[in-house]
A protein has these predicted regions:
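Condensing-enzyme catalytic core of the thiolase-fold
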Residues: 1-124
Length: 124
């Protein structure tokens, strides 16, 4: 199965909205840094080839990663995208650990959202 996505957000109205709330950095993104002052907008796309682990092993594929758990959250009842819920983030990560059968202390890498905003970084 191929799974892909794109993010096209550089239209003027979107840029203006993030700029108006002070979410955009005037220089560069520095997530989880005391000097963080917002993020830099960008666009991108990606596609992954997903396959059952047993099939990939049987086919002799060069396996780069295994998805063992997934957790998600939506802050629809909260203040919205600009003020993420710490509770929701904790629930999402807890679900992923539970599905994967891992303890948090065994995780070696976390791919964070890293918005370089005070609220977003503090929540993560």
């Amino acid at each position: 199965m191929l799974a892909g996505a794109t993010d096209r957000c550089m239209e003027a109205p979107t840029y203006a909205k993030f700029s108006a709330i002070g979410a955009l950095s005037p220089s560069h993104s520095t997530p989880f840094d005391a000097r963080a002052n917002g993020f830099v907008m960008g666009e991108g796309a990606g596609v992954l080839l997903l396959k059952r682990l047993s099939d990939a092993i049987d086919d002799g594929d060069d396996i780069k990663a295994v998805i063992r758990g997934v957790g998600g959250s939506s802050d629809g009842r909260g203040k919205g995208i600009t003020a993420p819920s710490q509770r929701g983030q904790v629930q999402a990560v807890s679900r992923a650990y539970s599905q994967a059968g891992y303890e948090p202390s065994t995780v070696e890498l976390v791919e964070a959202h890293g918005t370089s905003t005070k609220v977003g970084d503090a929540t993560e």
